[in-house]
Amino acid sequence: RKQPQQLALPEPEKTYTVTLTEYDLQTVAWACFAFRRNNNLLHELYSPLAAIGSKFAVEARDNAVEYRNTLRRFNEVVKRITADIEADPETNWRVLKHIRSFNEKIFGKVETTI
């Protein structure tokens, strides 16, 4: 009769503790927003580039699609590390409104009023 095997538990994910200034954290949040805008731009450029037969059409689409998952993960990290910060429209924290309203199902749509 076989003895039941004990399943190995997965290793806990490594964590890191870092110290960031407020400006550093704002820079990370703005980088996420810039990434989102650029990703959306690439997506929006595909059809017009394809319509004129540009060799860049496929590259624009591939980049928009390929980096969408990275953008989603980046946005989730920024949301998590800024969860306790108020989105203040009078400061650089105004970007948090955009980070927190990210909806990947609305592809190519981004609020551009800062």
Where are these regions (language model features)?
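Positively charged, phosphate-engaging catalytic surfaces used for nucleic-acid and nucleotide handling
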Residues: 1-114
